[in-house]
């Protein structure tokens, strides 16, 4: 691409998920419904954990942070995506694009580490129940959660600082529904080898470390479950672990497929569809899998609703 086609940009144009007019209403209603459920479930979960004393445990401490992160990064992306479905002007300012990417990246990396911490928490609870409250003390919980947010912030700052150094772009049209880094980098005129290499290395390192923690934790949990004498206890534990691993597999699978591979130079429709799963669907599924299927949460919700009705 010749240098004469390169220029600075003041704004980007987000193409969105589809340019087929007949799909606009269906897409809008579908994602509005998913976003509504996501907000209600995650904010409701946070509130329930705060008001219910029986949920003041390490597991629900981390679950409240997961709900907060899911709420945040879904809200960073979905409202703008919904607005762009019907808007002819799909522009987002350069600054707005960078801010959206930074906040999104911070939340996603935080969730990557938070899911690993939650897997470790389940390992301690099931495999070492007598030491659970000591091992996962308030101080330890705060330190682990803080580390997750710190890793998310640092990784995002690295990518943001490198992205801000790109002087010229050959186009301002992003083939995506939000400002993700790979499609933005594909528009750069300058050499982005460092950007792409760091994106690959950081994502691969984060994924490798956290997946290893998750797999090790659940393997040890599985070993403990198989030793249980109660068939009902085994079934309940298997069901819980299977649902957790399903959500984790979908989340990490899409992250791996998009960020932990050599750059293809563009963001195709397959990438956009895959991205929908961990930016829109997973925040909703997490609230269902980690909370609505949980007996303690159901009991706490029933107690809170009962007290409201009788008051």
Swiss-Prot record:
- Disulfide bond: present as a keyword of the record? yes
Q: Which cysteines share a disulfide bond? A: 97-189
Q: How does it sit in the membrane?
A: Multi-pass membrane protein
Mark the transmembrane ranges.
26-46, 55-75, 100-120, 140-160, 197-217, 238-258, 272-292
- Pfam families xrefs: 7tm_4
Name a GO CC annotation attached to this entry. Answer: plasma membrane
Localization of this protein:
Cell membrane
Q: Which family does it belong to?
A: Belongs to the G-protein coupled receptor 1 family.
- The name on file for this protein is Olfactory receptor 5L1
Q: What is the lineage of its organism?
A: Eukaryota, Metazoa, Chordata, Craniata, Vertebrata
Gene this protein is translated from:
OR5L1
């Amino acid at each position: 691409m010749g240098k004469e086609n390169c220029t600075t940009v003041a704004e980007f144009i987000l193409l969105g998920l589809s340019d087929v007019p007949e799909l606009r209403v269906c897409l809008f209603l579908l994602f509005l419904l998913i976003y509504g459920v996501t907000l209600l479930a995650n904010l409701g979960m946070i509130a329930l954990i705060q008001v219910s004393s029986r949920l003041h445990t390490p597991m629900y401490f981390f679950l409240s942070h997961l709900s907060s992160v899911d709420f945040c990064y879904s809200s960073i992306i979905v409202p703008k995506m919904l607005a762009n479905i019907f808007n002819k002007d799909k522009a987002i300012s350069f600054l707005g694009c960078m801010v959206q990417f930074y906040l999104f990246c911070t939340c996603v990396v935080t969730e990557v580490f938070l899911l690993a911490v939650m897997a470790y928490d389940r390992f301690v609870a099931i495999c070492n129940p007598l030491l659970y409250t000591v091992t996962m003390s308030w101080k330890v919980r705060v330190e682990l959660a803080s580390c997750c947010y710190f890793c998310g912030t640092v990784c995002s700052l690295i990518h943001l600082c490198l992205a801000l150094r790109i002087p010229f772009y050959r186009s301002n049209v992003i083939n995506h529904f939000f400002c993700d880094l790979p499609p933005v980098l594909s528009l750069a005129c300058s050499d982005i080898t460092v950007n792409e290499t760091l994106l690959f290395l950081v994502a691969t390192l984060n994924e490798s470390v956290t997946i290893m923690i998750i797999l090790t934790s659940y393997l040890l949990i599985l070993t403990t479950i198989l030793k249980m004498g109660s068939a009902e206890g085994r079934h309940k534990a298997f069901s819980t672990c299977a649902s957790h691993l399903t959500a984790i597999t979908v989340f990490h699978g899409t992250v791996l497929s998009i960020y932990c591979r050599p750059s293809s130079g563009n963001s195709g429709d397959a990438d956009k569809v895959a991205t929908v799963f961990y930016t829109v669907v997973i925040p909703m599924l997490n609230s269902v899998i980690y909370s609505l299927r949980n007996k303690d949460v159901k009991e706490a919700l029933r107690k809170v609703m009962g007290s409201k009705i009788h008051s």
